[in-house]
């Protein structure tokens, strides 16, 4: 949702605001090559990098309040020098609210706890505690890796307790009661607090939110064990969302870095994050991210399951995977990528590909299928998996394990065979009232992008589409945030509901904090461009505000309205750093004499002097007379020249 107001206008919703940020403070982590945003550092556990806090430059926190004053939806309000404000969708959570003291050791406030408890259809499972860092055993969650630590060990001394030392008991559905999923509620005609929150946030009627979820065209990922998250919806009828991937690897990164990446990604606009950790301390890293995440968190459980069996795909089993999924459900993972469509008979279809199987999860399960010459255990146990997801309201993100990894492989037989199977599994999940979205490619040339969306809608019954890019060319390592943002904008316009970001490090290495920002900004541009093309209500208000500021040479407002205010200001100040340049009617591109907008103002002033409006029509009777007199003058010139249409060229 984007709205524009002025100081004299009245609003139908109450709003509470905090002070705008006017200074540029140092960020939590050093970034020598990129100017940081106006952020400060929060208090953190000993030895842990502080996370970024504070409002974006020129912005302040505001809240939309509906009929129920207890329901407050956070937004970002950009304050302009004219006294107007522009209110935009905000994913940053409490980290940009100067009135909140952030301590990552305690996690974020569990805002949804009371909503969940009041429904009375879930209860704490006293047999379980969260999290554990040692080997798994009855009643204890953990990575299950021998030697990975014991309760109380690890870099931050956690194990079997919540981040602030309290034992946390996970919730699950009360047996015998109706479905506790947002899909179940929506189908029964019940409007939840989460749906009300989304309606305010998107600027849509709450009945639209309920109906889209009930039809399976949208998902509202909201695990009952992640009460810290701020509800959001993913679907064609809503703003296009973006996801940012995080997570360590066996080679690099740490828990501290991944928590800061999560905060940094949501600061710049990530609607969800996925923890794709494959290195050490997978469970502990995930716990820290979830407890501090204001957005839904997704995972790929097969990664942790593989770690439990020593990294050997052939040693995997349904039992190991099932226990891993339950552990992650109890921690609060909101959606999980499940590669249940990688069937044994589809694996040979990839043999003639230029780049084979490029999905990590897809390759792991293909390897298992070939090692045992059995059908994928995620496919054969899918109904049981649905029952587990339904107990916690976890959303399926049905993985495209056979997605194309190169332009040459786009829309091939393997990709489309798996897509048809995902459509089959979608209906199975819906029978269990489990929410579903479908993952898509990948690497797709522009001429095949719309076809991908049409096939997905047809084969997967209009379930929301969630795509990685797609990259529209393979020739630009180091710039794949650009090659993929092109495809992302196009596929978002065609109907994709969420775009998984790609960073400049794609295909090259693990992204750092700067890469995360570059990827998020690129994808926010793509998503917003798609919203504009779709004609989403209110999407253009932000563009119009910036266009006005640009035409009126309000430089400070241009900076503040930018997706990245600090970079916009830094680029301007590289050549015109003086304070006087902030009121100049030109920039260093055209200089004082060739600025098209300055000349346009002069043309308007001249037209206005003749009583004309900017379009050249009479703004008043005197203006009409000026137009008539001008036409008569030109007619007289034509007659004086002998009524000739073509005149000889004059010699110089």
From Swiss-Prot:
One of its GO terms (molecular function) is 4 iron, 4 sulfur cluster binding. GO terms for biological process: thiamine biosynthetic process; thiamine diphosphate biosynthetic process. Zn(2+) binds at residues 443, 507. It is an enzyme of class 4 (lyase). Its cofactor is [4Fe-4S] cluster. Keywords: 4Fe-4S, Iron, Iron-sulfur, Lyase, Metal-binding, S-adenosyl-L-methionine, Thiamine biosynthesis, Zinc. Residues 8-45 have a biased composition (Low complexity). Pathway: Cofactor biosynthesis; thiamine diphosphate biosynthesis. It holds the Pfam family ThiC_Rad_SAM. Residues 134-162 have a biased composition (Gly residues). It catalyses: 5-amino-1-(5-phospho-beta-D-ribosyl)imidazole + S-adenosyl-L-methionine = 4-amino-2-methyl-5-(phosphooxymethyl)pyrimidine + CO + 5'-deoxyadenosine + formate + L-methionine + 3 H(+). [4Fe-4S] cluster binds at residues 587, 590, 595. Substrate binds at residues 245, 274, 303, 339, 359-361, 400-403, 439, 466. InterPro entries: ThiC (IPR037509), ThiC-associated_dom (IPR025747), ThiC/Bza_core_dom (IPR038521), ThiC/BzaA/B (IPR002817). Catalyzes the synthesis of the hydroxymethylpyrimidine phosphate (HMP-P) moiety of thiamine from aminoimidazole ribotide (AIR) in a radical S-adenosyl-L-methionine (SAM)-dependent reaction. Belongs to the ThiC family. NCBIfam families: PRK09284.1 (NF006763), PRK13352.1 (NF009895), thiC (TIGR00190). This is Phosphomethylpyrimidine synthase.
């Amino acid at each position: 949702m984007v709205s524009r107001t002025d100081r004299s206008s009245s609003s139908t919703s109450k709003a509470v605001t905090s002070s705008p940020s006017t200074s540029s403070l140092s960020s939590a982590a050093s970034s020598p090559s990129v100017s940081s945003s106006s952020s400060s550092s929060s208090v953190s556990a000993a030895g842990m990098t502080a996370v970024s806090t504070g409002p974006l430059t020129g912005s302040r926190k505001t809240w939309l309040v509906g009929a129920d004053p207890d329901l407050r939806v956070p937004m970002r309000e950009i304050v302009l020098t004219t006294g107007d404000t522009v209110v935009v969708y905000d994913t940053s959570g409490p980290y940009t609210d100067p009135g909140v003291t952030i301590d990552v050791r305690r996690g974020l406030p569990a805002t949804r706890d009371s909503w969940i408890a009041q429904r009375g259809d879930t209860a704490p499972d006293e047999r379980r505690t969260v999290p554990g860092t040692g080997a798994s055993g009855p009643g204890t969650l953990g990575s299950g890796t021998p030697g990975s630590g014991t309760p109380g060990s690890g870099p931050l001394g956690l194990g079997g307790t919540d981040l602030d030392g309290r034992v946390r008991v996970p919730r699950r559905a009360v047996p015998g009661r109706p479905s506790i999923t947002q899909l179940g509620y929506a189908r029964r005609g019940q409007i939840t607090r989460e749906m009300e929150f989304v309606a305010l946030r998107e600027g849509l009627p709450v009945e639209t939110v309920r109906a889209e979820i009930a039809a399976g065209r949208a998902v509202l990922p909201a695990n009952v064990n992640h009460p810290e998250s701020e509800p959001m919806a993913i679907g064609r009828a809503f703003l296009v969302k973006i996801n940012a991937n995080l997570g360590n690897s066996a080679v690099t990164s740490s828990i501290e870095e991944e928590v800061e990446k999560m905060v940094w990604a949501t600061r710049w606009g990530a609607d969800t994050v996925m923890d794709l950790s494959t290195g050490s301390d997978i469970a502990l890293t995930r716990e820290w991210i979830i407890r501090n995440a204001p957005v839904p968190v997704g995972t790929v459980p097969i990664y942790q399951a593989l770690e439990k069996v020593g990294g050997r795909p052939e040693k995997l089993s349904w039992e190991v995977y099932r226990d891993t999924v339950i552990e992650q459900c109890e921690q609060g993972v909101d959606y999980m990528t499940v590669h249940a469509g990688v069937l044994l008979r589809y694996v040979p279809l990839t043999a003639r590909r230029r780049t084979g199987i490029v999905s990590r999860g897809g390759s792991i399960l293909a390897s298992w299928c070939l090692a045992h010459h059995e059908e994928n255990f995620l496919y054969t146990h899918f109904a049981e998996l649905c029952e587990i997801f339904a107990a916690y309201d976890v959303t399926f993100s049905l993985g495209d394990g056979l997605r194309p990894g190169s332009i040459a492989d786009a829309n091939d037989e393997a990709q489309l065979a798996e897509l048809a199977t995902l459509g089959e599994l979608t209906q199975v999940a819906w029978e269990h009232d489990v929410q579903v979205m479908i993952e898509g490619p990948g690497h797709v040339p522009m001429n095949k992008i719309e076809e991908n969306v049409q096939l997905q809608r047809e084969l997967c019954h209009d379930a929301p589409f969630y795509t990685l890019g797609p990259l529209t060319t393979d020739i630009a390592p180091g710039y794949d945030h650009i090659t993929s943002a092109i495809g992302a904008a196009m596929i978002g316009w065609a109907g994709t509901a969420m775009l998984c970001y790609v960073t400049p490090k794609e295909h090259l290495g693990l992204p750092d904090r700067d890469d995360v920002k570059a990827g998020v900004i690129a994808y926010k541009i793509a998503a917003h461009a798609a919203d504009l093309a779709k004609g989403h209500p209110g999407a253009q208000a932000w563009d119009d505000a910036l266009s006005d500021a640009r035409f009126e040479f309000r430089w400070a407002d241009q900076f503040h309205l930018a997706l990245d205010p600090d970079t916009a200001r830094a680029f301007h100040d590289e050549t015109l750093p003086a304070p006087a340049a902030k009121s100049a009617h030109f920039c260093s591109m055209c200089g004082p004499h060739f600025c098209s907008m300055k000349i346009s103002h002069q043309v308007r002033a001249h037209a206005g002097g003749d009583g004309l409006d900017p379009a050249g029509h009479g703004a008043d009777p005197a203006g009409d007379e000026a137009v008539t007199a001008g036409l008569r003058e030109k007619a007289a010139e034509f007659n004086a020249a002998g009524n000739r249409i073509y005149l000889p060229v004059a010699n110089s």
